[in-house]
UniProtKB/Swiss-Prot annotation:
Species assigned in the record: Rhodopseudomonas palustris (strain TIE-1)
Record-linked InterPro entries: ExoRNase_PH_dom1, ExoRNase_PH_dom2, ExoRNase_PH_dom2_sf, KH_dom, KH_dom_type_1, KH_dom_type_1_sf, NA-bd_OB-fold, PNPase
Protein name according to UniProt: Polyribonucleotide nucleotidyltransferase
Family: Belongs to the polyribonucleotide nucleotidyltransferase family.
Phylogenetic placement of the source organism: Bacteria, Pseudomonadati, Pseudomonadota, Alphaproteobacteria, Hyphomicrobiales
HAMAP family: PNPase
Catalytic activity: RNA(n+1) + phosphate = RNA(n) + a ribonucleoside 5'-diphosphate
Keyword Amino-acid biosynthesis: no
GO-annotated cellular components: cytosol
EC number: 2.7.7.8
NCBIfam families reported in the protein's UniProt record: polynuc_phos, PRK11824.1
Transmembrane regions: none
One MF annotation (Gene Ontology) recorded for this entry: magnesium ion binding
Length: 722
């Protein structure tokens, strides 16, 4: 019934198995990949004919995690998986980025890659396995894919690189780096690092590239057994059109790309394009070519002219040389009521970044395959259409916004203070108000400034820079702080963030083969110079965290109570803690280990809440004096609430010095009194005294009364002796 083919290798000390022919047989390509006991299914389906009216690759990649893979039932009312989580979106992008450049030029058939996690062993993260499975499924599918690719995760523990560290090891690593590529080229890098050097980062990339070669070999072995016949792809020769167009518009296009202002440049390029279209589509004549084809050739010509200019003259679109960073202006404290804010402007790219400090109530609960955990640092990136002078629909967060936000998150996360030292939930929002390249790195710079403006004690200021590359044969140019056009028309997008000490995040997307280790080394070195320059410009606004939190930020005090007292502080159904919050105005969060966090923007509220909680959580001490309230008057004495929720009895004989006829002669309900804890009777009832305490000053009179009594006893004895 099944025509099963499989390959198995040992990879990083665990078995990796790729199998096809048993599951999802109606897909063009389907591979079940197993690593340890983590299992994913990758499928590829491509439409039989090209999609009409498009001049791009219509590829969609979806990665999905099923709760059953970890033996869990989804939360929520419907108890089924809902919209993609942040992790699913990020892994979808992780798969997409290295495979997209490898589709043959001109492939316009709708192509969908779906990767589903079927089993998770809580040791091996499914993301790298998903990339491998998708590569294998594409290689088998028959679509024109110039793969396969391999992928690997690299850690750095005890000064050594570790291949595919298990989840438990990730807590110890100084580096989490995912790298993907072909047999002879690196195509994609995504990473977070604890201020590591350029040499260590480059070494990790090359280590990963070497160690996923056996995976590529295994996919090729499987393809030799089970690959489908390659799809036919008609390659159209546009050389004659390009030659004609070059003679028509080359000089005007070169002049347009010498205009430094983005909007003016786009307008000039638009006019040149109109001229080309008018030439190839004269009015009243039957057109010889399809409009999309002409537009595609024009786009290719744009890229060539920009690239030629840079390589021939060393000058870029806006007149800079390859190493110069655009003009920078950094400002902090730009919004009056926020906890921290910054406006970071670099050329025609601008980010307004705002930091908000919250409490434990504001932590994000993340439901993942490995369980639910709390996230205390959030960074959100928004890219409204006005930032590029366009109109557009505002709706849900797009994949690109999630990806850019996570990149900035990775850049900042390593320099944040430990949560036990700075127990705030931190949310940073980057609003991109202008964009002409490198908006994610502007978000990193703005986030660092906004956090320091809010008083968050970062280890060091952090900055980011986007690098580009133009490669033609033996000639190449590495570009610092790229423009949007240089990003689109170049061969590499290379984003580096970090401090003066080292790199905290590295993201790389390479569109062509042939980028050597030496070129990457040059790019990293040039990026370091640019990063140090940007940090210097940022320091003109703020070079360290403010000594005090923002005026409107909450203050948090942390202390511990015995775990057996947590129930008393919370009360039945949360009654006690709700009363504390309502009456003091402070927010209270109690963790399972007895850690209590009390937060408020008002210091008196915090003091009141702490005093209340401590009075409940600790036991009163015999001999201590407390202030209390008379809650009930009886014939034999008065009950006084004196220690949180604790009441005690002041017997009538302990109300006042001398004989008391009626309790009500001395106290009534609601009176504020000072009492001394005498002890506990045989039944554990609390015994209090008022008469041994000065009700005005709170002074302990018992010692004084004993001294007086002793003195009175000695006087008659002396008289008798005389």
């Amino acid at each position: 019934m099944f025509n099963i083919h499989s390959v198995e290798i040992d990879w990083g000390g665990r078995p990796l198995k790729l199998e096809t022919g048993k599951v999802a047989r109606q897909a063009d390509g389907a591979v079940v990949a197993t690593y340890g006991e983590t299992v994913v299914l990758a499928t590829v389906v491509a439409a039989k004919s090209p999609r009409e009216g498009v001049d791009f690759l219509p590829l969609t990649v979806d990665y999905q995690e099923k709760a059953y893979a970890a033996g869990r039932i989804p939360g929520g009312y419907f108890k089924r998986e809902g919209r993609p989580t942040e992790k699913e979106t990020l892994v979808s992008r992780l798969i997409d980025r290295p495979i997209r450049p490898l589709f043959a030029d001109g492939w316009r058939n709708e192509t969908q890659v779906i990767v589903t996690v079927l089993s998770h062993d809580m040791e091996n993260d499914p993301d790298v396995l998903a990339m491998v499975a998708a590569s294998a499924a594409l290689t088998l599918s028959g679509v024109p894919f110039k793969g396969p690719i391999g992928a690997a995760r690299v850690g750095f523990i005890n000064d050594e690189y570790v291949l595919n560290p298990v989840l438990d090891e990730m807590a110890e690593t100084q580096l989490e780096l995912v790298v993907a590529g072909t047999a002879d080229a690196v195509l994609m890098v995504e990473s977070e690092a604890k201020e590591l050097s350029e040499e260590i980062m480059l070494g990790a990339v090359m280590f990963g590239h070497r160690h996923f070669q056996p995976v590529i070999d295994a996919i090729i072995d499987l393809a030799e057994k089970a690959a489908k016949e390659p799809r036919e792809l008609t390659v159209v020769d546009d050389s004659e059109i390009e030659k004609e167009m070059l003679g028509l518009v080359e000089q005007e296009l070169r002049a347009a790309y010498a205009i430094p202002v983005k909007q003016d440049r786009y307008a000039a390029v638009g006019k040149v394009k109109e001229k080309a279209i008018a030439h190839f589509f004269p009015e009243g004549q039957e057109p010889k070519y399809d409009k999309l084809r002409i537009a595609g050739v024009f786009k290719e010509l744009e890229a060539k002219i920009v690239r030629w200019n840079i390589l021939d003259t060393g000058k870029r679109i806006d007149g800079r040389d390859s190493k110069t960073v655009r003009n920078i202006l950094a400002q902090v404290g730009v919004l009056p009521r926020t906890h921290g804010s910054a406006l970071f402007t670099r050329g025609e790219t601008q980010a307004l970044v705002v930091t908000t400090l919250g409490t434990g109530e504001d932590e994000q609960y993340v439901d993942s395959l490995s369980g639910t955990y709390k996230e205390t640092f959030l960074l959100h990136y928004n890219f409204p259409p006005y930032s590029v002078g366009e109109t557009g629909r505002l709706g849900g967060t797009k994949r690109r916004e999630i990806g850019h936000g996570k990149l900035a998150w990775r850049a900042i996360h390593p320099v944040l203070p430990p949560h036990h030292e700075f127990p705030y939930t931190i949310r940073v929002v980057s609003e991109i108000t202008e964009s002409n390249g490198s908006s994610s790195m502007a978000s990193v710079c703005g986030a660092s400034l906004a956090l320091m403006d809010a008083g968050v004690p970062l280890k060091r200021p952090t900055a980011g820079i986007a690098m580009g590359l133009i490669l033609e044969g033996e000639r190449f140019a590495v570009l610092s702080d790229i423009l949007g056009d240089e990003d689109h028309l170049g061969d590499m997008d290379f984003k580096v963030a970090g401090t003066e000490q080292g790199i905290t995040s590295l993201q790389m997307d390479i569109k062509i083969a042939g980028i050597t280790e030496e070129i990457m080394k040059v790019a990293l070195g040039q990026a370091k110079d640019g990063r140090i320059h940007i940090l210097g410009e940022m320091s003109k606004a703020l070079d360290r965290a403010r000594a005090e939190l923002g005026e409107h930020a909450p203050r948090i005090e942390t202390f511990k109570i015995p775990t057996d007292k947590i129930r008393e502080v919370i009360g039945t159904g949360g009654k006690v803690i709700r009363e504390i919050v309502e009456k003091t105005g402070a927010k209270v969060n109690i963790e399972d280990d007895g850690t209590v966090k009390v937060a408020s923007s008002d210091g008196e509220s915090i003091k009141a809440a702490i005093k209340w909680i401590k009075s409940i959580a600790s036991d009163p001490e015999i001999g201590e004096i407390y202030e209390g309230t008379v809650v009930k008057v009886m014939e034999f004495g008065a009950f006084v609430n004196f220690f949180g929720a604790k009441d005690g009895l002041v017997h009538i004989s302990q109300l006042a010095a001398g004989r008391v006829q009626k309790t009500s002669d001395v106290v009534k309900e609601g009176d504020k009194v000072k009492v001394k804890l005498l002890g506990f009777d045989d039944r554990g009832k609390t015994r209090l005294s008022m008469k041994v305490v000065d009700q005005t000053t709170g002074e302990d009179l018992e010692a004084k009364q004993k001294a007086e009594a002793k003195a009175e006893g000695e006087a008659p004895a002396q008289a008798a002796g005389e």
